[in-house]
Amino acid sequence: MTLALHTPGLKDMAYRQRLLSDPETMAYNRGRDFGGAPGYHPETGCIDFPREDWRYWRQVWLLNEPQFFSALLYDEDADCPVGEVTYYFDGEADAHIAGILIEHRHRGKGLCAEGLRLLIEHAFAREDIHVLRAEIPGDNPPALKGYRRAGFHDFGCRDGVHALIFTREDYEK
């Protein structure tokens, strides 16, 4: 499988909608406390992504780099998306928060680490990004393993949530 980052077009938003509404894909998100975030369904972990939000979402996530970035993780051999990668700047953490979501039927193939490596390459090609950070609950061992295999290292753990970071210095080694 050859993976690449693919900038999503408006036609790709239907895939993102299916991804976020799939209970098997979103099971890792089930029961989390997001402070009453609109569109989040704690019983399934799914997140609403209605069609009327697509253009606005694209304006925020695709036209405001380095504040926001999103790309589909694309299997070039099969000519189809297998998930998405993102980052956004968190001023409080003074870091870009990295994320990856792999469609459930493509999990267990090492795509998390490979997709994160592509995200790392993209992020650190920019001079204005210095730290990628992720907060992964301890009850998600596959995600922890994927981030660590991609080169993220532990920064701390509080209330069972692991803070992992990847710095520009890590990238330049």
List where the protein language model places each region.
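A short beta-loop-alpha structural element at the N-terminal edge
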Residues: 3-21, 26-30
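Acetyl-CoA-dependent GNAT
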Residues: 10, 26-98, 103-105, 157-158, ...
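Amphipathic alpha-helical recognition patches that constitute DNA-binding helices
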Residues: 15, 96-97, 101, 115, ...
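Alpha-helical elements of Rossmann-like donor-binding domains used by nucleotide-donor carbohydrate transfer enzymes
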Residues: 15-18, 56, 114, 118
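Conserved acetyl-CoA-binding loop-helix of GNAT-fold acetyltransferases
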Residues: 102, 108-122, 144-149
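Conserved beta-strand-loop-alpha-helix junction that forms the acyl-donor binding cleft
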Residues: 103-104, 118, 133-144, 161-162
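Conserved GNAT acetyl-CoA-binding A-motif
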Residues: 125-135
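Conserved catalytic-core motifs of GNAT/GCN5-like acyltransferases
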Residues: 133-136, 148-166
